[in-house]
Design a protein with these regions (language model features):
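Conserved beta-strand-loop-alpha-helix hinge in the C-terminal portion
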Residues: 112-133
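Hydrophobic aliphatic residues
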Residues: 2, 78, 123-126, 136
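Aromatic-residue hotspot detector
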Residues: 58, 132-135
Length: 140
């Protein structure tokens, strides 16, 4: 992946070591990926996505298969990327995660945008779960 993104060799090894260490993958990097658990494959995919230091990431359910420690680490990495001027679009069915991590929220139902905006505005005085359930009731 580092080759595909033309990450210089001098830069890639420190980045691989950094992210592998943070995601507890260091001792497993020499193993065949086919021997990895689902969670380890998810960590490797995240490491691969970060290796070229992107400004934009698009992630589909990035926390599925991760243990709580790895999920916490990934949340921190996502926040760091955004705090440094990057952006992340990610899908999740866990509304509490979206509420804690996201500055902007969009709720999509059957491929149609139902509501979007700053997290604080979308959730109002309730939670995202409250908003979602209310939207579901309105839809029925």
């Amino acid at each position: 992946v580092a080759d595909a993104f033309k990450v210089p060799k001098k830069k890639r090894n420190p980045l691989i070591e950094k992210y592998a260490g943070m995601l507890a993958l260091t001792k497993d990097l020499g193993q065949l990926v086919s021997s990895y658990s689902h969670g380890m494959k998810q960590k490797l995919a995240i490491l691969s996505a970060l290796i070229h230091e992107p400004k934009l990431m698009i992630l589909d359910e990035p926390f599925v298969g991760l243990d709580p420690v790895a999920a916490h680490t990934v949340k921190g990495l996502m926040r760091e990327l955004c705090d440094n001027g990057g952006a992340i679009f990610f899908s999740t069915h866990v509304l509490e995660v979206a509420e804690k991590l996201c500055d902007q929220i969009a709720i999509i139902r059957q491929g149609k945008l139902i509501v979007s905006g700053p997290t604080e505005e979308v959730r109002g005085n309730g939670s995202l779960e409250d908003v979602f359930l209310e939207l579901e009731e309105d839809h029925e």
